[in-house]
Structure formats: structure tokens, C-alpha cells
């Protein structure tokens, strides 16, 4: 796979039965970094298990199992190339914490592929189905580019009437959420049979649109914020024998280089970067979008952990916060949310309880106009301005300064009850600890 193509991160969203896994598996299978030997091995195993029909989803299941078992993910397995771009699938659907991952992970997505099934569309698109929630989330979290794959066209005899019906429904909803649907390709596909995935299908002469691969090639490459100061939320911290402490994470903004002094917030620990590695290769620098491990001097694995943020000690270093003000949209909370409510907030890689200190205003979701000052309570469907206080040290940023560190999910009762975008942050003046 060539190094010269622009990289784009793709998140695949949609209901459980939409055929996301098969569709994603098909792309990776046809265009991806899985070598023929591995594919033959998977095919042999899947036919031995009588799963021959599921070979694309099977590819994905095997990858998922490997991803869940092992620490090191062979990222190449999750990549595929279109004529124009190099795509990485950054979250495989069907994961228990998918919505949480979408928020902490969608910060990483440049494009969302929304897969809707032609066979059981009504169920997937009902109030209870996840399709609407995923689309709203993608928009709230700043993913502005989308492709809609109307999948399983083989189950409705490739009928135009069915495509049109689903198109109208999804198009209407996406407009309501805030998407400019003129720019969204709607593609008629079968991830299982392969229609309009890579090659144009001859079964839908009425369909004048693009294949999925052509649609992927019409997306705009992301503008990577290299000119902003460094922000790198830690996904994990490893202790590697003979090397030392190695934090791992994705560069969100700025650049990280060996020799640089980095500060980890909220702890205020500062140290020197010895080396930066990606896919087991040393790099002279890493830029936004790169998933890297970097080796740091004299820092114990006890000093830093997942959810901390690495930043340049000499250029707007990150700090912990006293509190932050956010616009919060309540998605599905069974009751009423009042001042004092203290759910878990997932922001970038951090997972910390935060208190709704003051709900200062209820607002209109679309226009942002204030509807009511200091409301007594908010409930599902409401948008509000809330001052939030972390109950443990936390580093977040305003969405306008550092977008990936300025959006979050509110989790309670094992589900995402709200999402938020941070307007402003009261920072703690850190007492720095030099290492």
C-alpha cells in the first residue's frame, strides 16, 4: 500500500442488522491490506464452520476478535485504498460501547458511512433503532461528511421504489439534524452480493448514482490541524522491558517530535520525548491523525494513565480544569435531569464522573436561542447550557480551540444519555512537576 495517498478516517454507523460488518468486511477484503494468505485461511475456516456465506462479515469478526485479544492491533488490517485515498476504518460497528466509542472515536472520523438496510429499514429507523441516534451523534460531534449506503438491495429485488422510499425518509431526517444532504451521496448497494461496492451493478439500471468506492473518492481530505499546539490524549500507557514507559495515543492537533518536552495534564508531569514510533517504525515526527507510541524519560507508569493529555510544555501546555460550560443535548434519559446530577462523562479518552453544577439555560437545538433561563430540569430532546464540574482531575478544551477535546458523551445506566460540546473551560493553574 502506497504512502503517498491522503489518509482519511472512516467510521461506519447504522443499526445492528444493517449489514455494516459485511459491507465493511467487503471493502477491506476487496481493497484492503489483508494479504491473500490470511483471506484464504479465513475462507477455509469459515467454510469449515459452514459460514461460507458470511465470508466478509467473517473477515471482520476475525479482525475484531484479534483486536480484542491482543494489545497490538495490526492497523494494516483495517485499511483499504480507493483510487484516490487511503482509508482507515477507525471503529468497527457492533461493539457494546459503540456510541461511547463513536464520541471518543468519532473525534477521529473524517467521514461517516451510514448503512441502512433495505429489508428491515422501518425497525432500524424507528425511534428505538440506533440509526437516527448515530446520525445525530456524528453531526453533533463534527463529522460533516457522510455517505449513505442503502444496503441489502438484493433483498427487495433491487426495486427503485424501495430505494426512493428509504432515500426520502433518511434525507428528511439528515436535513433535520443539520446535514447539507445535497453533498451526501446515497448509494444503492449489497455488501453481501457486492452490487455497487467496487464494480457497478447491472441489476439496477434505474440507479444513476455512484458506486461506494466512487462515493468515497468524492470526499474532501481533512485539514489536519498541524499548526495548533500539540494535544495527544493517551489511549494506554505500556511498560516495555528495556525501553521504559511508552504512552500510546493519537495526535489530535500539533506535532510531536523526539527531543520535545511534553507536559501531561491534568497531572502536570513534564518530561522529554526520547522517540516516537508508528507501526514499529521510528518517526522523526508525528502529525494529527497518527496513532503513535512514544517513549518518555523518567516517568513511571504510575504517573500517567489513559485519559491524560500530552502537550508541548513550551506552547500552550494542557491543564486540568475546575469546571467547563457546555451545550448538552439530552438523547435518551428516562427521567429528569436537575442540578447535581453526576453521571460519567467520556471525553476524548478520559472517563470521569462530572456534576451538572448549574443548568443555566434551555436552548433551541437548531438556532441556539435561549428558551428559558435557569430551568428546574431538562429531559430527553432538550438542549441546554450547563456548567459541569469534574469529580476527579480532568483535562478538556473548548471545542473551538481543540475540537476532539471539546466534545463528550454523558453515560448513565449503561447507555449514552446525552452528548455535549464544550463552550469554555476554567483551567486549573498547574503546579508543575519536572521529571
From Swiss-Prot:
GO terms for molecular function: GTP binding; GTPase activity; translation elongation factor activity. Keywords: Cytoplasm, Elongation factor, GTP-binding, Nucleotide-binding, Protein biosynthesis. Residues 70-74 are annotated as: G2. GTP binds at residues 14-21, 91-95, 151-154. It is found in: Cytoplasm. Residues 91-94 are annotated as: G3. Transmembrane segments: none annotated. Belongs to the TRAFAC class translation factor GTPase superfamily. Classic translation factor GTPase family. EF-Tu/EF-1A subfamily. This protein promotes the GTP-dependent binding of aminoacyl-tRNA to the A-site of ribosomes during protein biosynthesis. This is Elongation factor 1-alpha.
Amino acid at each position: 500500500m502506497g504512502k503517498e495517498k491522503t489518509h482519511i478516517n472512516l467510521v461506519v454507523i447504522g443499526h445492528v442488522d444493517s449489514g455494516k460488518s459485511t459491507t465493511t468486511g467487503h471493502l477491506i477484503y476487496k481493497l484492503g491490506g489483508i494479504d491473500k494468505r490470511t483471506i484464504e485461511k479465513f475462507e477455509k475456516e469459515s467454510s469449515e464452520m459452514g459460514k461460507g456465506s458470511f465470508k466478509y462479515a467473517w473477515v471482520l469478526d476475525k479482525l475484531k476478535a484479534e483486536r480484542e485479544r491482543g494489545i497490538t492491533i495490526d492497523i494494516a488490517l483495517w485499511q483499504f485504498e480507493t483510487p484516490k485515498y487511503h482509508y482507515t476504518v477507525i471503529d468497527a460497528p457492533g461493539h457494546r460501547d459503540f456510541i461511547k466509542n463513536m464520541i471518543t472515536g468519532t473525534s477521529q472520523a473524517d467521514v461517516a458511512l451510514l448503512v441502512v438496510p433495505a429489508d428491515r429499514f422501518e425497525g432500524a429507523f424507528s425511534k428505538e433503532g440506533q440509526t437516527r441516534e448515530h446520525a445525530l451523534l456524528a453531526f453533533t460531534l463534527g463529522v460533516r461528511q457522510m455517505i449513505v449506503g442503502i444496503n441489502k438491495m438484493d433483498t427487495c429485488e433491487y426495486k427503485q421504489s424501495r430505494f426512493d422510499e428509504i432515500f426520502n425518509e433518511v434525507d428528511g431526517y439528515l436535513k433535520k439534524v443539520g446535514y447539507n444532504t445535497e453533498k451526501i451521496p446515497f448509494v444503492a448497494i449489497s455488501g453481501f452480493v457486492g452490487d455497487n461496492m467496487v464494480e457497478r451493478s447491472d441489476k439496477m439500471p434505474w440507479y444513476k448514482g455512484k458506486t461506494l468506492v466512487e462515493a468515497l473518492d468524492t470526499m474532501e481530505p481533512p485539514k489536519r490541524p498541524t499548526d495548533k499546539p500539540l494535544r495527544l490524549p493517551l489511549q494506554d500507557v505500556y511498560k516495555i522491558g528495556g525501553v521504559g514507559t511508552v504512552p500510546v495515543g493519537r495526535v489530535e492537533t500539533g506535532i510531536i517530535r523526539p527531543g520535545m518536552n511534553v507536559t501531561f495534564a491534568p497531572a502536570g508531569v513534564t518530561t522529554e520525548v526520547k522517540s516516537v514510533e508508528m507501526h514499529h517504525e521510528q518517526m522523526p515526527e508525528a502529525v494529527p491523525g497518527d496513532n503513535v507510541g512514544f517513549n518518555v524519560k523518567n516517568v513511571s507508569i504510575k504517573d500517567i494513565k489513559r485519559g491524560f493529555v500530552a502537550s508541548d510544555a513550551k506552547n500552550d501546555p494542557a491543564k486540568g480544569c475546575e469546571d467547563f460550560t457546555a451545550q448538552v443535548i439530552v438523547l435518551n434519559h428516562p427521567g429528569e435531569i436537575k442540578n447535581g446530577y453526576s453521571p460519567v462523562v467520556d471525553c476524548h479518552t478520559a472517563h470521569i464522573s462530572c456534576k451538572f453544577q448549574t443548568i443555566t439555560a434551555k436552548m433551541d437545538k437548531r438556532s441556539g436561542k435561549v428558551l428559558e433561563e435557569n430551568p428546574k430540569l431538562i429531559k430527553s430532546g432538550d438542549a441546554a447550557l450547563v456548567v459541569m464540574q469534574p469529580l476527579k482531575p480532568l483535562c478538556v478544551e473548548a471545542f473551538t480551540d481543540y475540537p476532539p477535546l471539546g466534545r463528550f458523551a454523558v453515560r448513565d445506566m449503561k447507555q449514552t444519555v446525552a452528548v455535549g460540546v464544550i463552550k469554555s473551560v476554567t483551567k486549573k493553574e498547574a503546579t508543575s512537576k519536572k521529571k
